[in-house]
């Protein structure tokens, strides 16, 4: 895989699926990579929503749970993924960042013997859920359910992230939760940010993080 003319090109030399979003604006020079979850029920549904002008939001890339890639905007164009955001004294990260959305339901609520997405109302099995606190939670906040990411999805995100870091000499990898704390919680505690960031920044500690899962605590 490579990046050519700010588009992702697959190993067979063909561009990855490209569906252009209207929710973008002018040219920019990216400095950061921002990770998100879609909070939707499918990658296809999230792509369709981000291509709807009514959404007024879109990332540059959506990664499905099967590792599939759909690009919505060239990597040198402003995509409206960050919203009101601040990092290191600078605001409006749409203007200097690339956004990746991973198909993931995010927060889940327990309803009887099922886990339900508050957004899509879709149910998820225990095997796809982890219990955790968000890093921005107040002390004493009880843990809640979070939708797990798939291994192939995380590997696809890593490979794309490595390409983006090299191509654009990006300074850092951040979560939406870092640049809009209190307003956003993605990509959330199910995303292994420490190891992901270490791999992309070329640091020694790239081991996967471990979390309490439902199977371990017998919920």
Question: Each predicted region: which residue ranges?
Answer:
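Active-site-adjacent loop/helix surface patches within enzyme catalytic domains
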Residues: 2-171
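Histidine-centered divalent-metal-coordination microenvironment in nucleic-acid enzymes
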Residues: 97-101, 180, 188-192
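Aromatic- and acidic-residue-enriched segments that line the glycan-binding/catalytic groove
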Residues: 117-120, 185-199
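Acidic/histidine-rich, metal-coordinating catalytic segments
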Residues: 168-183
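Extracytoplasmic and endomembrane cell-envelope/extracellular-matrix remodeling and assembly machinery
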Residues: 195-211
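Conserved small/polar residues in nucleotide/adenosyl-binding loops
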Residues: 217-219
């Amino acid at each position: 895989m490579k990046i050519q003319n700010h588009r992702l090109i697959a190993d067979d030399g063909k561009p990855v699926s490209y569906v252009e979003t209207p929710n973008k604006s002018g040219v920019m020079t990216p400095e950061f990579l921002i990770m998100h979850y879609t909070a939707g029920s499918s990658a296809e549904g999230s792509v369709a929503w981000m291509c709807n002008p009514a959404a007024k939001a879109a990332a540059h890339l959506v990664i499905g749970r099967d590792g599939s890639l759909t690009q919505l905007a060239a990597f040198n164009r402003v995509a409206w993924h960050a919203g009101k955001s601040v990092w290191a004294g600078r605001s409006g990260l749409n203007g200097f960042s690339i956004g990746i959305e991973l198909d993931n339901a995010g927060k889940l609520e327990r309803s009887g013997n099922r886990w339900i997405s508050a957004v899509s109302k879709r149910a998820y099995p225990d095997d796809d859920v982890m219990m955790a606190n968000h890093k921005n939670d107040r002390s004493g906040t009880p843990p809640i359910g979070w939708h797990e990411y798939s291994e192939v999805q995380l590997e696809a995100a890593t490979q794309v992230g490595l390409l983006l870091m090299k191509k654009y000499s990006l300074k850092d990898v951040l979560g939406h939760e870092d640049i809009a704390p209190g307003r956003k919680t993605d990509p959330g505690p199910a995303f292994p940010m420490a190891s992901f960031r270490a791999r992309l920044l070329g640091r020694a500690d790239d081991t996967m993080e471990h979390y309490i899962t439902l199977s371990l605590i017998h919920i």
